């Protein structure tokens, strides 16, 4: 009972207390703060090379804002602001900024009545975009260990830095010369083959351009040649076994007469001339004169004879001595049919020269009319091995012989030469006169003739025969296909009793039209599926 009385007493006391506090409170209609609220959600958007936009959420009751912008600053706001702006809305476009520059911006909400009640600053940091005045790299600009950068001449720039694109590490820095600045061009070295890089152009530490590139395959030991170089002079000063690696572009051999006349490069040492890119071959205008036993290799180049000052052959041997190989691979050679230089032929040997081998493979040879000479023409020399393999040869030797090889065997100890004509597409050659010879071969070493192989060729649209010479050996014929070969004696056997020495391909005959894809444009893909299955002609 005692406990119940205590609880009852406490409850009654609490009830009286609550009743005493039930007087109504006044309604709060206005709150006055010590200062304006700072802008919130401040951010920089649409940042370009010279502009940016600041946005923020408007502060309640605020009509004006003050903005300060500091250049080359990272939220320290030291020194004098670059510019100050007063606006009455929560967005502002900043203009006339400097490219690739760090900026700090801050915004204050202003109290219209009492500056002491202005808000605290809201701050933001941003960086303007770098410029892009570098032009794109051409194939010619990028080497295996170097690169050439270009930009508009006269721009204010002072250095280039190259970074490894994968790691971001700085690889090399190059200080621009006055000549570089004037010409808008700089050559940077010290790189590695087949590596991804980013090159950046600067002015006072600010980026004015950036381009990425990948260096090409290793050209160790090669002399890199660009179309702006004096290639003729480089050939004149060549050293033994020098390799010239050419970018795409046009290289005119000097020495010709007239404005457009291309001359002849004298090759008197073993050298290699190769194009760097198979799909963008450099074009050489001119010819080659071989002397003093030189060897010459041409790979991935175009040789244009249409501008030559002389219509002499592309390769002319001039001194009587022993020569290294002439190697031609994946090239294109052409002359003019009428307008331009109408070439005499492809090579010419009219001196007592011994040539280790002439190898012509994987190439396009066309429009060498042969005005004044035969196509492959050896009058007084000795070619140990002549190999013509996997080429497309068309519109050549209009009224002349294909291979001429006169008998100078006594001058060389009566050797037996080797001739291999394999896997070629030969179209519209020896088609201007009847009875021209594919093999006008009379070099009769040891009175045993020659070793000749004619295999897997596709021969079309010709009036030629193989030969009519008693000293031409019967070739070994294998799997050759013919179309529109109008002289039946191309297939005829010899009849020595009647002094007829045809030595023709008796296993061959005129077949169906191979239906070349577009011969007028040099496209000799065989569209006739039945013939294509025979694997005859150039396989490209």
Model-found features: residue ranges?
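Recognizes extended acidic, P/S/T-rich segments that occur
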Residues: 66-100, 112-113, 161-192
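Acidic, glycine- and Ser/Thr-rich low-complexity intrinsically disordered tracts
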Residues: 469-540
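Right-handed parallel beta-helix
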Residues: 294-305, 323-337, 355-369, 383-398, ...
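Pro/Thr/Ser/Gly-rich low-complexity, intrinsically disordered linker/stalk tracts
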Residues: 22-61, 99, 114-155, 193, ...
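Beta-strand-rich modules
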Residues: 94-116, 188-209
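Acidic Gly/Asp/Thr-rich repetitive segments characteristic of extracellular carbohydrate-active
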Residues: 217-258, 528-538
């Amino acid at each position: 009972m005692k406990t119940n009385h205590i609880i009852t007493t406490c409850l009654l006391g609490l009830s009286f207390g609550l009743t005493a506090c039930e007087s109504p409170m006044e309604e709060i209609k206005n709150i006055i703060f010590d200062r304006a609220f700072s802008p919130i959600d401040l951010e920089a958007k649409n940042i370009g090379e010279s502009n940016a936009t600041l946005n923020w959420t408007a502060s309640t009751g605020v009509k004006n804002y003050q903005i300060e912008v500091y250049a080359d600053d990272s939220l320290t706001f030291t020194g004098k602001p670059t510019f100050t702006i007063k606006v009455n809305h929560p967005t502002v476009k900043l203009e006339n900024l400097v490219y690739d520059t760090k900026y700090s911006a801050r915004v204050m909400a202003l109290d219209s009545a009492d500056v002491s009640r202005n808000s605290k600053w809201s701050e933001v940091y941003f960086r303007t975009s770098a410029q892009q005045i570098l032009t794109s790299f051409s194939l010619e600009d990028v080497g295996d260990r170097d690169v050439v950068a270009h930009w508009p001449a006269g721009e204010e720039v002072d250095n280039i830095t190259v970074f490894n694109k994968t790691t971001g590490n700085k690889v090399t820095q190059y200080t621009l010369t006055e000549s570089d600045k004037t010409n808008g061009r700089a050559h940077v070295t010290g790189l590695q083959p087949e590596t991804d890089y980013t090159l950046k152009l600067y002015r006072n530490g600010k980026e004015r351009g950036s381009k990425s590139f990948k260096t090409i395959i290793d050209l160790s030991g090669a002399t890199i040649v660009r179309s702006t170089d004096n290639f003729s002079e480089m050939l004149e000063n060549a050293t033994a076994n020098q390799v010239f690696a050419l970018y795409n572009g046009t290289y005119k051999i000097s020495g010709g007469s007239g404005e457009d006349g291309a001359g002849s490069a004298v090759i008197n040492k073993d050298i290699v001339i190769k194009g760097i890119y198979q799909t963008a071959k450099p074009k050489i205008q001119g010819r080659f004169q071989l002397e003093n036993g030189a060897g010459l290799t041409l790979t991935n180049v175009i040789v244009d004879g249409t501008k030559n000052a002389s219509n002499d052959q592309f390769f002319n041997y001039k001194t009587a001595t022993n020569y290294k190989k002439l190697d031609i691979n994946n090239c294109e050679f052409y002359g003019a049919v009428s307008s331009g230089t109408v070439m005499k032929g492809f090579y010419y040997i009219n001196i007592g020269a011994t040539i280790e081998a002439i190898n012509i493979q994987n190439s396009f040879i066309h429009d060498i009319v042969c005005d004044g000479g035969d196509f492959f023409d050896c009058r007084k020399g000795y070619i140990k091995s002549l190999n013509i393999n996997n080429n497309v040869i068309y519109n050549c030797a209009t009224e002349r012989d294909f291979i001429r090889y006169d008998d100078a065997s006594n001058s060389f100890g009566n050797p037996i030469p080797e001739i291999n004509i394999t896997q070629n597409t030969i179209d519209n050659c020896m088609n201007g006169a009847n009875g021209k010879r594919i093999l006008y071969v009379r070099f009769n070493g040891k009175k045993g003739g020659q070793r000749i192989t004619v295999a897997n060729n596709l021969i079309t649209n010709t009036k030629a025969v193989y030969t009519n010479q008693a000293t031409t050996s019967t070739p070994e014929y294998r799997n050759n296909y013919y179309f529109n070969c109008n002289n039946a004696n191309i297939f005829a056997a010899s009849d020595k009793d009647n002094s007829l020495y045809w030595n023709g391909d008796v296993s061959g005959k005129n077949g169906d039209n191979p239906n070349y894809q577009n011969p007028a444009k040099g496209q000799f893909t065989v569209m006739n599926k039945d013939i294509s299955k025979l694997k005859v002609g150039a396989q490209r």
